[in-house]
């Protein structure tokens, strides 16, 4: 595991312990049961693909550890609406505060502004966080295979599926892909960013895509900025993408989203 993930795990486990003291699991489970039903995340992506379109998971991200502040005028509902107008299939909302200046309130506000399904983008280490995600309206969660062992990943996946949510299984090498394929979720995200060096290359997706069975939904993550990048990954069968930073930096987010998703004539 990389040094960055070690640091993140340390503060996340402190956060989780504090959250459990503040809001016991039973209370959180009641809130999750009372939450609006999940919107189908995988089904929304597959519907776009069935229409012959790219399927975009558009990310709402204020900052990152590597780039610092990305968008000073940060308005999650307005950004969600812009993404929906631009043709996104789903949202991804950062909820980690120390590294990304995210918050669960941003997830609630963004999802309420649109009809799109939303992913809680965070570092998941405990099933408590899964219930917390559903209680705040999340339709999908992220499992980073590099951060968890097989037993932890399976427990978190089971908790999400039991609550009717979808799961994005994130991998960035062959070994992590093999582990992810042993789980139940059909959605496999290939992170083009090396979590140890922070180097980004689309070659990661190009190398792993042929190893992913056709019944799985492949998602390209990180390093995707232009229509040419989308076309490059589509050539290896990857037509679903998670894009954040490049769109978050644009003044007109809806127009930038439309431009990114426009296939060459």
Curated annotation (Swiss-Prot):
Keywords for this protein: Amino-acid biosynthesis, Aromatic amino acid biosynthesis, Decarboxylase, Lyase, Tryptophan biosynthesis
**What GO terms are given for molecular function?**
indole-3-glycerol-phosphate synthase activity; phosphoribosylanthranilate isomerase activity
Record field: catalytic activity: 1-(2-carboxyphenylamino)-1-deoxy-D-ribulose 5-phosphate + H(+) = (1S,2R)-1-C-(indol-3-yl)glycerol 3-phosphate + CO2 + H2O
Any one Gene Ontology BP term: L-tryptophan biosynthetic process
Primary enzyme class: lyase
Q: In which pathway does it act?
A: Amino-acid biosynthesis; L-tryptophan biosynthesis; L-tryptophan from chorismate: step 4/5
Q: What is its EC number?
A: 4.1.1.48
Query: Does this UniProt record's set of keywords contain Amino-acid biosynthesis?
Result: yes
By sequence similarity, the record places it as follows: Belongs to the TrpC family.
| This protein's name | Indole-3-glycerol phosphate synthase
- Specify the taxonomic lineage: Bacteria, Pseudomonadati, Pseudomonadota, Alphaproteobacteria, Hyphomicrobiales
Gene that encodes it: trpC
């Amino acid at each position: 595991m990389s040094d960055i993930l070690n640091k993140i795990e340390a503060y996340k486990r402190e956060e989780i312990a504090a959250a459990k003291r503040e809001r016991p699991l039973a209370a959180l489970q009641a809130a999750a049961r009372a939450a609006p039903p999940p919107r189908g995340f995988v089904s929304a992506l597959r519907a776009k693909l069935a229409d012959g379109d790219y399927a975009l998971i558009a990310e709402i991200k204020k900052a990152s550890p590597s780039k610092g502040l990305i968008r000073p005028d940060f308005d999650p509902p307005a950004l969600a609406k812009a993404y929906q107008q631009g043709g996104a299939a789903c949202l991804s909302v950062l909820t980690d505060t120390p590294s990304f200046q995210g918050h669960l309130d941003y997830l609630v506000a963004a999802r309420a502004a649109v009809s799109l399904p939303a992913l809680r983008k965070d570092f998941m280490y405990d099933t408590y966080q899964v219930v917390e995600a559903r209680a705040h309206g999340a339709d999908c969660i992220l499992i980073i295979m590099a951060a968890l062992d097989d037993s932890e990943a399976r427990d978190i996946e089971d908790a999400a599926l039991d609550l009717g949510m979808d799961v994005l299984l994130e991998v960035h090498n062959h070994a992590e892909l093999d582990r992810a394929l042993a789980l139940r979720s059909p959605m496999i995200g290939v992170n083009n960013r090396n979590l140890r060096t922070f180097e980004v290359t689309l070659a990661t997706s190009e190398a792993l895509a042929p190893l992913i069975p056709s019944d799985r939904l492949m998602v390209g993550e990180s390093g995707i900025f232009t229509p040419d990048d989308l076309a490059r990954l589509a050539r290896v069968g990857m037509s679903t993408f998670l894009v954040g930073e490049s769109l978050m930096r644009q003044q007109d987010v809806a127009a930038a989203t439309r431009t990114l998703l426009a296939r060459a004539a």
